[in-house]
A protein has these predicted regions:
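Active-site metal-binding loops of divalent metal-dependent hydrolases
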Residues: 67-69, 95-98, 126, 188-189, ...
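Metallo-beta-lactamase
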Residues: 144-203, 319-324
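Cap/insert and terminal regions of metallo-dependent hydrolase folds
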Residues: 2-4, 120, 127, 211-213, ...
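Short, well-ordered alpha-helical microsegments
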Residues: 100-104, 131, 164-165, 222-225, ...
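Internal active-site segments that recognize and position negatively charged phosphoryl groups
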Residues: 181-186, 203-223
């Protein structure tokens, strides 16, 4: 059994309990209020969403710049950066831990990728593993490794208020087309106990003779809510789902000092509750009900136990995304 917090920390926590317990109780009150608020807001957003005129793309190609799992010669990290290319242009989705860890710059260089090869950047949500590192999250400023070149004023599509040096920032307030024939669901909310109110946008695109492809960053709003929005935006068949779903059931990625951070701070549960196989089973059932033909799993926020269950139990061709790999969607 993996402890979410190493027993070495337990004496410290016991000593700190007179301060820690009241703080957790206050946070729990805010967390519960925000749970209700997020559910109501998402429902309102879905109900008022209008169908999007998604262009029929002749092709949609994904190159994975940052992921936990890798092709040989690439660096893995518990973050995400996906490059989408279409017959109408290209869009970079997230920048992993940016310049604070080596994976983004190393993998981009190995792939020969620089920012002048994309039309725009979209950030799924304002967490460190997607917007460029812990300093980026604290300052709410998207940060990209300088080795990847200058942004040159290109658009950075954001789901919430933030800055992005060198980019022209554009706040996405609802479902809309972005660039390269790729659209955003608009921000969808989730209350997280430690990280607080989180807005996340997923991407969707329509591929000719196939259907709609949906990609998430972490999937914090849950894939069920994201797919409800997608159904409002398009009546085309669902062809593929990809990206993070956040299921660290048995352990988390990127653990530090004996603390399983992903199991504590990103699950949408209070820290004394652990995300379970029952919740994983519910999500697997929801994906099977949606009936995509392909599922592309992110390992950056999902443990190997959960990945294996997805691969074995989802009724679709399922594979785990790897940094350095290309996928023709």
């Amino acid at each position: 059994m993996a402890f979410r917090i190493s027993p070495l920390w337990w004496p410290v926590m016991t000593a700190a309990s007179p301060v820690l317990v009241p703080m957790l109780l206050r946070k729990n009150g805010r967390f519960k209020k925000n749970l209700t608020r997020a559910n109501e807001l998402n429902q309102e957003r879905i109900e008022r969403a209008e169908p999007l005129e998604l262009p029929k793309l002749d092709f949609l190609e994904l190159t994975v710049l940052v992921e936990e799992k890798t092709q040989e010669g690439f660096l893995g990290d518990a973050g995400v950066s996906y490059l989408f290319r279409t017959d109408q242009g290209s869009l970079l989705y997230d920048v992993g831990f940016g310049p604070t860890r080596p994976a983004m710059a190393h993998n981009a260089a190995k792939l020969g990728f620089t920012l002048d090869q994309v039309d725009a950047l979209a950030i799924s949500h304002l967490h460190c593993d997607h917007m460029g590192g812990i300093p980026a999250q604290r300052s709410k400023q998207v940060t990209v490794p300088e080795e990847m070149g200058l942004p040159g004023g290109k658009t950075c599509f954001l789901p919430d208020e933030a800055k992005a040096e060198g980019f022209t920032t554009e706040l996405v307030k609802g479902p809309r087309l972005l660039t390269a024939g790729i659209a955003s669901t608009g921000p969808l909310a989730r209350s997280l106990f430690i990280l607080g109110w989180t807005e996340e946008q997923a991407l969707l695109a329509r591929v000719r003779d196939k259907g709609v492809v949906v990609f998430t960053g972490c999937g914090h709003p849950t894939i069920e809510i994201i797919l409800k929005m997608v159904r409002r935006l398009s009546n085309e068949p669902l062809y593929a789902i990809g990206g993070g779903l956040h299921f660290p059931v048995t352990y988390g990625r990127g653990n530090r000092a004996g603390i399983q951070f992903q199991m504590l701070i990103g699950t949408g549960l209070p820290p004394w509750r652990q995300i379970s196989d029952d919740e994983l089973s519910s999500t697997i059932a929801s994906i099977n009900e949606a009936a995509p033909k392909h599922v592309y799993l992110s390992a950056h926020d999902t443990c190997d136990h959960s990945l294996k269950r997805f691969e074995n139990e989802v009724n679709a061709e399922t594979q785990v995304l790897r940094a350095g790999a290309k996928y023709h969607l």
